[in-house]
Amino acid sequence: IPKMFEEISVKTWAYEFATSIGYRNVIVTDENGEDIVCADSMWTLMDMETKHPVRIEEEDAKGYEIEPRYPMEKCGRKIRLPKEFEVVDTVVVPKADIDYNGHMSNAKYILLANEYVEDITCVNRIRVEYKSQARYKEALVIERAIQEIEAEAGMETHVIIKMSGKEAGDVKAVVDYRLTEA
């Protein structure tokens, strides 16, 4: 993680378009030219009137130069949820968290979830699955689960934060924090 006032550079590029989905990488590089943060993201092209996905046409993609995908761990689209969660809070979405699309900004879900991870400095990977949109003044039930997952390199500790509306099954977002050894 860069230190305060350290110069960094950020680069982002598209690496694939498929039906209504665009894939892109983001890399943060320190002042020595070393990659210190990498991200992989999926974006959906939406018709803002119908709120439905639309096909990415050749004309839409023409303005993007496709570059190779950054060599990083490839995660599945869905975060596997544990069976049991503990309800830790209920919060109301403030106006400041609403983006120009009229729903809670994607970045705000992560900032909110960070509040429920005991030691954020032990996190070495964050995965987010956005499921539905939270709106202004909507109450979000915050649930947390801590689980051990067997991986190739051994056991991993994950903190899973689930944010849901008041209705059963109305999950808005799930954030999975993989922790390093303490």
Sequence positions of predicted segments:
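HotDog/MaoC-like acyl-thioester-processing domains
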Residues: 2-78, 131-139, 146-182
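Catalytic strand-loop segment that frames the active site of acyl-thioester-processing enzymes
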Residues: 45-51, 56-121
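Ser/Thr- (and often Asn-) enriched beta-sheet segments in non-cytosolic proteins
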Residues: 90, 141-144
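Short alpha-helix capping/helix-loop boundary micro-motifs
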Residues: 126-128
